[in-house]
Amino acid sequence: MKTAVSALALAAGLTLSLPVLAESRTSYGPQLEGFSYPHPLKHYRFESQGKPMQMAYMDVAPTGQANGRTALLLHGKNFCGATWERTIEVLSEAGYRVIAPDQVGFCSSSKPEGYQFSFAQLAHNTQALLQQEGIDQVSVIGHSMGGMLAARLALNYPQLAEQLVLVNPIGLEDWQAEGVPYAHIDQLYQAELKTDFDSIKAYQQKFYYNGNWKPEYDRWVAMLAGMYAGEGKERVAWNQAQTSEMVFTQPVIHEFPRISTPTLLLIGGLDRTAPGANRAPDEVAKRLGNYPELGRQAAAMIPQARLVAFPDLGHSPQVEAPEEFHRALIEGLQR
């Protein structure tokens, strides 16, 4: 009897694990052709650096009483516009039109060869997309790498950004100045080629969720892994290496005192994200990614900044605790 029960339990466990296993091996294509976005994708087609490009984006109308405002959502390096799924719903219900693009080199947008990536270039591309849509002012909300891009957008196009929200942005410290060794693109590319579902999940569990994991996070891991799981993975890996180098060598923090836009910092205090810390000496690595302190320092540097801390949350508070996060976001935007 005990053997039969054990066998049934094992079978049940295997059955439950099959969807995750299958999802972890799914190839969605280098531009996520096979991944289902929460809203229809539009495509902004343009030429940049002599090459034809397309930026995919979601353009979601307000479902609540329209307030005449537009929210621009900028994804992080290990995220896509789709990861903003619940935030899009909340903002739309609050009356916002929501624009959520995938940046060039990421997710469902072009994966160009020979492209010179910079935050200024990505900000320009995004501004041009908004211009095409007839949008002249936005509340800019950037998460992780998207926070660095949001800051650059606010600096380069101050007339465009009426509000700035930085959600656990990376780049609140200058890693190279702190003593993290430089890694060239060829090194980063070789590391990117090893990316798969398990490596993405392990990284996110350690740095984003403080060792915890919920089954609903698997979808976002599978989304990223799906770009590496089939044909085209080399182009994906190369663009990811290029943008890793961009993040490391193009700090925005030194310009924070020049940000004139009213700014809201939403900071999960358990976040320890610090790109390059794995190659830094121990004495350097251990002081990096101290987000409670980094958040306070950033709030002091930006002239019109307000800090809201989530002491028990990590790198992705909008995913980890959506109700708490979105309550703070909406309250902050309405001030």
Predicted features and spans:
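N-terminal signal peptide c-region/cleavage motif recognized by signal peptidases
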Residues: 17-19
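An N-terminal hydrophobic leader/cap segment in hydrolases
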Residues: 21-46, 55
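Active-site loop/oxyanion-hole signature of alpha/beta-hydrolase fold enzymes
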Residues: 45-51, 58-64, 93, 103-141, ...
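Conserved HGGG/HGGXW glycine-rich cap/lid loop of the alpha/beta-hydrolase fold
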Residues: 49, 53, 58-108, 319, ...
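Flexible "cap/lid" loop of the alpha/beta hydrolase fold
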Residues: 151, 155, 164-195
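Conserved alpha/beta-hydrolase catalytic His-Asp/Glu region
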Residues: 195-256
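Conserved serine/cysteine hydrolase catalytic core
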Residues: 229-295, 300
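Catalytic active-site module of serine/aspartate enzymes centered on a nucleophile-bearing elbow/loop
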Residues: 292-335
